[in-house]
Amino acid sequence: MANNAELIKQCEERAQQWLTPAFDEETRNEVKAMLEAEDKSALVDAFYQNLEFGTGGLRGIMGAGTNRMNKYIVGMATQGFANYILKAFPGEENLSVVVGHDCRNNSRLFAETVAAIFSANGIKAYLFESLRPTPEISFAIRELGAKAGVNVTASHNPKEYNGYKAYWSDGAQVLAPHDTGIIEEVNKVTIDQVKFEANWDKIKIIGGEMDYDYMTAVHTAMIDQDVINRQKNLNIVYSAMHGTGRVIVPLCLRSWGFQNINVVPEQMVVDGNFPTVVSPNPENAEAMTLGMKLGTKLNADLVVATDPDADRLAIVCRDDKGEWMIINGNQTAMMFCYYIIENKKKLGKLKPTDFLVKTIVTTEVIAEIAKKNNVELRDCYTGFKWIAREIAISEGKQQYIGGGEESFGFLPYDKVRDKDAPASICLICEIAAWAKDQGKTLYDLLMQIYAEYGFSKEFTVNVVRPGKTGADEIKQMMADFRANPPKELGGSKIVTWKDYQSLEAKHADGSVEKLDMPTTSNVLQWFCDDNTKVSVRPSGTEPKIKFYIEVKDPSFKCAGCYNRCTAAAMDKIEAIKKSLNQD
């Protein structure tokens, strides 16, 4: 890496290019201030590299500069995407894309910029009239027969961030070969090649009709209308976390037959600054504080929330003492899979060709549920585009009935090809109604699943290593694990080592088998003789490496064992962290 003086000089030269008339006055003033400041750290951070358009699109802090989310970086990304679409469908007329956005600051500006550039390139842009949930954008791409789509969102990241997700014609985020093809085109674009001037004949505003069609599709995820009719007064508290679920989720719940829906008023206000939470992430208990407070006041049965772009959900239920308990992403996926199988079976709707999908880092309890019920379960890589791929390759042959991942994302039907929080919230409320119909809570149901299929405790360790030195360190950690794989984890003997880069599974008896995956991935997994599972993968979007630990306890027999088994599992997890030098 260049030394400090060299780096500052390079950044100053890059910044000077942003003082030309190609950039607006506001941008020029921001860059000027960075150039004139004595402290050059802001300048360096904004210009030391280009914000990378990766396989998931763009994500970064908003502001002026090559390493920031702004309309010029969004513009170059869109011009590259448009160039790729035109090459992918040569000579084809009436090409179209769908453009949507979330509640974040500048999201509307970026979405309008995207629509303008597509239209200027002769591609019709269906632009949503205002913010919409991510799953509705996926649905609209399929419904309108569009060739691609763009969603301006940074999901649950802090307020300083925004992002750009690229979708293909199936409504899923782009996979090979399109992902690398788009990246190649984006990397060729210079600012003077971007066609910013909109062709208004090629822009169509969409909204209400698509909302209705999407909500009609969500309705098809319902399994048992009768149980909802009996428990229509289930006491539900909902929070939109200042985002896109604010209108759609309550409407979907009412259309399913739920009549007692209470919203967290402070969090139904659209606000890209997310003033009521530290971080708008449903994985953080703090973000659910206001919902739980209202739930206590109203004596609610459960509290549910969506993240700002409404692709992920959070669920809070009452435990055996009546206290609020956050159901984690693995437990959520378990409950969905259990309920879908149990009730489709009971109602005669389960078919031999039905299948479920989970990511490789998600709990193996789902595998037990599927196995005991003779339902096919497929494992795929982390990221919902891989679940979408499994749906796509089986279309017309087998029926997808549900799939999810540990990071609070689930899709209970095949009308959408991304995580769908509105549909998932409706289904979890149906599950809560089903439990209540039997005099149980979601907590009781969770304990029942553990008793029947085995207890597991999952824990994720995030090791953050920022900057270039951090990236090198993460690379070295993975290389070391490959060169000298561990033999045991926290006292448990490893019996299988899986490497998704070489696509091999090596067993303790010396046998080797090929892993059946669509491509390679930089992931390692270790399985122990006591069913402990550890997965290691560097994050694709952040400077960190993740360790996903899953520990089993066969001694779990009933709800009374929960605290004991959880404590024992946490002790085991600490021992595993120690053996991996991550304590």
List PLM regions with ranges.
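Glycine-rich phosphate-binding loop plus the immediately following alpha-helix
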Residues: 167-195, 330-354, 358-367, 421
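Phosphate-binding and adjacent anionic-ligand microenvironments
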Residues: 296, 300-302, 323-325, 343-537, ...
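An N-terminal, well-structured beta->alpha segment
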Residues: 5-114, 200-236, 244
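N-terminal small/polar loop signature for handling phosphorylated ligands or for N-terminal nucleophile
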Residues: 98-161, 259-315
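Conserved phosphate/anionic-ligand binding catalytic regions in large, soluble enzymes, centered on
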Residues: 47-67, 154-157, 240-248, 252, ...
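Short acidic, glycine/serine/threonine-rich loops at helix termini
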Residues: 108-113, 138-142, 160-166, 195, ...
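Gly/Ser/Thr-enriched, mixed-charge loops and adjacent short helices
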Residues: 18-22, 26, 42-51, 162-289, ...
